[in-house]
């Protein structure tokens, strides 16, 4: 509760005023039957028009006050719940933004989206309902019960028999509800993950003619969610008829015994009418409570899932950084006996005893078979992952001693998977330097061999890339990402297979731009093609998570078996022997 009070406190007036407004509505509901009884007993039976008009006027005034209270309660309840949800959603989003890659790996993307949207909405709806019903339902129950007892204690005994039976049924339903709603949220996770994956990769699906497979896959996820939803909704389907059964049974018993009492002359007809109204109010208030508890079961499941995100321990932080103001100045990179596993309990190392040094301004290529750990290795430099053993140093300082902000400001990465965001080309390039001028942007794009195709678009640099950059080709995406990195002008630039979708001539011009524009920056190039790294100052050869060779192209071609295999598999034999 302490956690959630943090989100209640800023809007405490709304949380207080809303229920107080509902009290006005409850008082009106309790008083109304007495006015109705007065109209019947004192007005209709005595044929007193004045009494009827007076009581009717009182009922109208009371109804207006009830309406004002109801509107006020709904308004302040909505204000409180919407603000609560907005602040909670903001904090969950900020927490996710602080996640390391390892943290994100523990949650699926679809699950995080569900928790940010659906789960927060469930809590918002529950709070809105709670503020409207928390005082109204108990107020109607207690007020109706008191008035019923005051009117006719003997008839009120009927409630003492029916209420315990009703409460037992409600308790059973609520206890069964929590695991069912929790299961339902998990199925929503699975469905969201399925939808996100299929929509994101729709081009691949169409190119492999897998639409039918994906439709069936979605159908299974949708059917699972439907079944989970039906299982949860069975509570409502079961609970509502029970409530109605008890309501009608209680009303019939009251009408039977009360009618006999009226016929015997021991009770007035107006009082019986008021008593029946109070009984109805009591049972309706119990229905409200049951609805509230059913919603609370779903909200509790959602709150647990949100708490899992908020309680997730961030694997990477700079709380223990020794030099929080230190910035990357030279770009010297050193690995000392680094080991790494993606899963701490795994026996297989992704990186095994990695040791090397890159001097400032050097261009170093990293090459090796697919899955040998190249991308994982460079992820250690900006601390996207932390090492299990050994240490990574930049300018002689352990990366853990830098603040994450200053460390990552000094490192630029063009990832293997090129990522662009919805918006214009200019907006995407400004990620590299938000203060860059138009001239700087165009210069970076020109060196990345992107200015030509950008100018061919109708709006040039204001051309809308679409969601995820879907309006440009793979090669154009790569060049835009390179331009973004050039604009950042980092001390360490990491290129993770970033020119795989461009031709060799364009790649050569991009490499030349790196040499001239970033001559003082350390450049690390991961590549599948030897032509991409053969002119590097040094080349690191990797195989199965280990370094098998470090040296120049000619040196490795003579002495390193893995490098020879890659080279001869890519080069024409005549060219290789020339």
What do these predicted ranges mean?
Residues 47-54, 147-161, 231-305, 309-310:
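Helix-loop-helix
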Residues 2-5, 13-34, 55, 59, ...:
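Alpha-helical segments in transporter systems
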Residues 326-578:
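ABC-type nucleotide-binding domain
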